[in-house]
Amino acid sequence: IVVVFPNKRASLFLDTYLAEIEHEAIWSPSYITISELFRQNSPLKVADPIKLVCDLHKSFVKCTEIDETLDHFYGWGQMLITDFDDIDKNMADAQLVFSNLKDIHELDDISYLTDDQKKMIQRFFSNFSEDHNSELKKRFLQLWSHFLDIYNDFNSRLAQQGLAYEGALYRQVVTDENLKFEHKKYVFVGFNMLQKVEMQLCDRLMKEEKAVFYWDYDKAYMDNNHEAGHYIRQNLKYFPNELDADSDKSKLEANENGNESGQSAENIYDNLSRKKRINYFSAPTENVQARFVHTWLKENGLCKETGNVAIVLADESLLPTVLHSLPKEVEHVNITIGYPLQQTPFYSLIQQLIQLQGIGHPKASNTYRLHQVLATLRHPYARYISQLNLQVIEQLESKKTFYPDRSTLIMNEDEGLAILFRDIDKVENLDEYNMGLLNYLIDILKQIGYNTKQQNVDQLFQESLFRSYTVINRLRGLVESGDLKVDTITLERLILQLFQTTSIPFHGEPAVGIQIMGVLETRNLDFDYMLVLSCNEGKWPKGVNDASFIPYSIRKAYGLTTIDNKVAISAYYFYRMIQRCQHLA
């Protein structure tokens, strides 16, 4: 038996509950996510996101004969991959989707394009101006006419390397007529929206009598046309619930199991009608509400509570402030949100190093600009590169040299200073310089790791260092293989972008202590006490990003994801999260 969850978090809690019920050691069932189920049954691997854009750029140039640089292509290349992914996950016919735009009446009015989309398209059309909508329409149609060719070439290019984007991998699995599933039974628990490709997989397993389904919902949003129940109502039509709320069997099983409260399956799905203590609080700023965590935990006597309290962050950027606001009495905390790498000193260090070797180092010279040198040496982690950093600062300030040379900066032939002020621009071409910059950043991180090896640095420092190294090394591999060919400005922008989107996972006992989690981590989990921060419009549900080359009417016609889908999903997350909660703030 394999239990399939929407995410991994629920499996950790289920293990704990099974142990409590049995009171002795038992064999734990196997757990996987639905994404892992697809990946286990495909010979393809999901490619690195940057690798995907690089290969898409090659397909674009081949199919359109527009020799556009990768840095100009990068932004809308990501958008196009998202559209391709959506087409495949919803099992739409790409040929029909891309050909129909030429015929729909929206093209008489291109207002559905956002300003950002227009700017992206304009990069390809140097003679286009905002006043010439007809010209934009003409050029945009020309671009659209190549999208099917790009889609086919891109998928073929990736498949030849044994790679795919996620939607293409999913589609490959469900269209494989020879697919054999490894396990005898798959138990799907707690899903809401199933994309068409996922529904086809579930349907196939059910027809082979290998799948059962457990749905989590409440009667309050199953009647009428409540948006929170939209997908559950649909799922129940195709995939019957093992806990049938209306069956005599479920009530009989509840009695046989000695359920003293008479909690039948019918009762399990009727929780929102019960009384709850709900408090609303307003705060003038995001930071003020984050600091309210301290007050809420203390006033409710929850500091030492284990496992039954959750703080949900609709805006996950509040995590650092929330962590600093926890009362000292709190003994155990489990954090399911990754700590943003951008919030660590390593992000600012990488920024400073890029500036030092860029605007801080005049090309073809042996000197550095004093401003960038001092800013780098004063960074809190500079002492981990060289313990002479403060001595160099004193020397520079006493001499008042605005362009110190390398020999002055590398005091006492110090190894760390020699790495820090290494010349990386004595190369013959752009690719060599980019490799030199990435190797330079990696060597700095290695130096920090070596110098802190014997020191008692905290775990966050160690994890931040490791993640920083991983990000840079990932880019180095793409440049080295020839997949990533960009100018240095674009490379620097990519480095910082990756740091901004990378999180550091926390490790701890998952079912112990106060839970601090994002919205998605609440799926399948129930808590008696919940504090939801940033429960505002624009935060939950989040402002919808509809950046796409496919207009709403076509998306709707071919069953692609629209704003309607996203609103229904957000509504379900909210109502499901609170349905069994007793104290909500």
Predicted segments — roles?
Residues 559:
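Conserved active-site neighborhood of enzyme catalytic/cofactor-binding cores
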Residues 381, 563-585:
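C-terminal accessory regions
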Residues 1-554:
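Nucleic acid-machinery interaction/catalytic patches
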